Amino acid sequence: MPVYRLTASSIISSFRVSGKRHLLLTGGRGTGKTTLLRALVPLLCPGAQEITTAAYPADRVEIRESVGGKIAVIGRFDPALPPGENRMRPVADGFLLLGVPALHRMAAGESEWAVLDELGYLENSCPEFRQAVEALLDAKRVLAVVRKQDTPFLNAL
Protein backbone atom coordinates (compact mmCIF):
# COMPACT_ATOMS: atom_id res chain seq x y z
CA MET A 1 0.00 0.00 0.00
CA PRO A 2 1.48 3.41 -0.93
CA VAL A 3 2.27 5.94 1.76
CA TYR A 4 0.94 9.43 1.12
CA ARG A 5 2.61 12.53 2.51
CA LEU A 6 0.74 15.76 2.80
CA THR A 7 2.07 18.64 0.76
CA ALA A 8 3.00 21.98 2.29
CA SER A 9 0.06 23.66 0.56
CA SER A 10 -2.44 21.10 1.89
CA ILE A 11 -1.05 21.53 5.41
CA ILE A 12 -1.40 25.31 5.13
CA SER A 13 -4.98 24.96 3.87
CA SER A 14 -5.87 22.73 6.82
CA PHE A 15 -4.09 25.05 9.23
CA ARG A 16 -5.94 28.13 7.97
CA VAL A 17 -9.30 26.38 8.24
CA SER A 18 -8.47 25.24 11.78
CA GLY A 19 -8.36 28.78 13.17
CA LYS A 20 -5.27 27.89 15.21
CA ARG A 21 -2.75 30.61 16.05
CA HIS A 22 0.46 28.54 15.88
CA LEU A 23 1.67 25.69 13.69
CA LEU A 24 3.94 23.26 15.54
CA LEU A 25 5.54 20.41 13.62
CA THR A 26 6.57 17.42 15.68
CA GLY A 27 7.93 13.98 15.00
CA GLY A 28 10.87 11.70 15.55
CA ARG A 29 14.40 12.24 14.31
CA GLY A 30 14.80 12.14 10.56
CA THR A 31 11.08 12.35 9.76
CA GLY A 32 11.32 15.50 7.65
CA LYS A 33 10.17 18.18 10.11
CA THR A 34 12.77 20.73 9.02
CA THR A 35 12.25 19.88 5.35
CA LEU A 36 8.53 20.53 5.77
CA LEU A 37 9.19 23.75 7.69
CA ARG A 38 11.46 24.99 4.86
CA ALA A 39 8.61 24.32 2.39
CA LEU A 40 6.04 26.09 4.62
CA VAL A 41 7.99 29.29 5.36
CA PRO A 42 7.73 30.90 1.88
CA LEU A 43 4.03 30.01 1.66
CA LEU A 44 2.95 30.94 5.18
CA CYS A 45 5.37 33.50 6.60
CA PRO A 46 7.94 34.80 4.10
CA GLY A 47 10.37 37.22 5.67
CA ALA A 48 9.68 36.09 9.24
CA GLN A 49 12.60 36.21 11.64
CA GLU A 50 14.01 32.78 12.44
CA ILE A 51 16.01 31.03 15.10
CA THR A 52 17.49 27.74 13.96
CA THR A 53 19.63 25.10 15.58
CA ALA A 54 22.27 22.89 14.03
CA ALA A 55 23.56 19.70 15.62
CA TYR A 56 27.10 18.49 15.03
CA PRO A 57 27.12 14.89 16.30
CA ALA A 58 29.72 14.06 18.94
CA ASP A 59 30.59 17.76 19.18
CA ARG A 60 28.00 20.52 19.75
CA VAL A 61 24.61 22.09 19.06
CA GLU A 62 24.48 25.69 17.85
CA ILE A 63 21.71 28.26 17.82
CA ARG A 64 21.61 30.83 15.00
CA GLU A 65 19.63 34.04 14.66
CA SER A 66 18.58 34.80 11.07
CA VAL A 67 18.94 38.56 11.51
CA GLY A 68 22.66 39.25 11.71
CA GLY A 69 23.62 35.56 11.59
CA LYS A 70 24.83 35.43 15.20
CA ILE A 71 25.72 31.92 16.40
CA ALA A 72 26.19 30.48 19.90
CA VAL A 73 26.77 27.00 21.30
CA ILE A 74 23.83 25.71 23.37
CA GLY A 75 24.97 22.11 23.80
CA ARG A 76 28.28 20.26 24.08
CA PHE A 77 28.80 16.55 23.57
CA ASP A 78 29.58 14.68 26.78
CA PRO A 79 30.94 11.15 26.24
CA ALA A 80 30.33 10.43 29.94
CA LEU A 81 26.56 10.51 29.38
CA PRO A 82 24.88 7.15 28.73
CA PRO A 83 24.81 6.07 25.08
CA GLY A 84 21.67 7.07 23.24
CA GLU A 85 20.00 10.12 21.80
CA ASN A 86 20.67 12.84 24.38
CA ARG A 87 24.43 13.10 24.87
CA MET A 88 24.68 16.87 24.79
CA ARG A 89 25.01 18.95 27.94
CA PRO A 90 23.26 22.33 27.87
CA VAL A 91 25.44 25.45 27.64
CA ALA A 92 23.56 28.16 29.56
CA ASP A 93 25.56 31.06 28.10
CA GLY A 94 24.40 30.24 24.57
CA PHE A 95 20.77 30.47 25.64
CA LEU A 96 21.26 33.52 27.84
CA LEU A 97 23.56 35.57 25.61
CA LEU A 98 21.98 34.83 22.22
CA GLY A 99 18.79 32.77 22.50
CA VAL A 100 16.85 34.87 24.99
CA PRO A 101 17.70 38.27 23.45
CA ALA A 102 16.93 36.90 19.96
CA LEU A 103 13.50 35.70 21.11
CA HIS A 104 12.80 39.12 22.64
CA ARG A 105 13.82 40.82 19.38
CA MET A 106 11.51 38.50 17.44
CA ALA A 107 8.62 39.26 19.81
CA ALA A 108 9.16 43.00 19.34
CA GLY A 109 9.66 42.75 15.56
CA GLU A 110 7.25 43.84 12.86
CA SER A 111 6.50 40.42 11.34
CA GLU A 112 3.27 38.70 12.33
CA TRP A 113 5.16 35.38 12.41
CA ALA A 114 8.27 33.95 14.05
CA VAL A 115 9.98 30.69 13.05
CA LEU A 116 11.78 28.32 15.46
CA ASP A 117 13.67 25.25 14.26
CA GLU A 118 13.99 23.34 16.53
CA LEU A 119 12.95 23.19 20.17
CA GLY A 120 14.30 20.15 22.00
CA TYR A 121 15.49 18.80 25.33
CA LEU A 122 18.38 21.27 25.76
CA GLU A 123 15.94 24.17 26.04
CA ASN A 124 14.33 22.51 29.06
CA SER A 125 17.45 23.42 31.08
CA CYS A 126 17.08 27.21 30.75
CA PRO A 127 14.05 28.79 32.47
CA GLU A 128 14.79 32.18 30.93
CA PHE A 129 14.73 30.70 27.43
CA ARG A 130 11.50 28.81 28.13
CA GLN A 131 9.87 32.01 29.41
CA ALA A 132 11.04 33.92 26.33
CA VAL A 133 9.50 31.23 24.08
CA GLU A 134 6.23 31.51 26.02
CA ALA A 135 6.31 35.32 25.63
CA LEU A 136 6.95 34.88 21.89
CA LEU A 137 3.93 32.58 21.64
CA ASP A 138 1.84 35.31 23.28
CA ALA A 139 3.20 38.06 21.01
CA LYS A 140 3.41 36.38 17.58
CA ARG A 141 2.11 33.56 15.50
CA VAL A 142 4.77 30.86 15.56
CA LEU A 143 5.79 28.19 13.07
CA ALA A 144 8.05 25.77 14.92
CA VAL A 145 9.67 22.38 14.80
CA VAL A 146 9.34 20.65 18.17
CA ARG A 147 11.39 17.55 18.84
CA LYS A 148 9.25 14.61 19.91
CA GLN A 149 10.54 14.03 23.43
CA ASP A 150 9.12 13.84 26.91
CA THR A 151 10.27 16.96 28.79
CA PRO A 152 8.13 19.36 30.84
CA PHE A 153 8.82 22.25 28.45
CA LEU A 154 8.09 20.34 25.25
CA ASN A 155 5.00 18.73 26.75
CA ALA A 156 3.67 22.18 27.73
CA LEU A 157 3.94 23.37 24.13
Language-model features and meaning:
Residues 1-21:
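Extreme N-terminal, non-catalytic leader segments
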Residues 2-4, 28-33, 42-45, 121-124, ...:
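A short linear-motif detector with a strong N-terminal bias
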Residues 3-5, 88, 92-96, 122-126:
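A conditional alpha-helix N-cap/helix-loop micro-motif detector
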Residues 14-104, 156-157:
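Conserved P-loop
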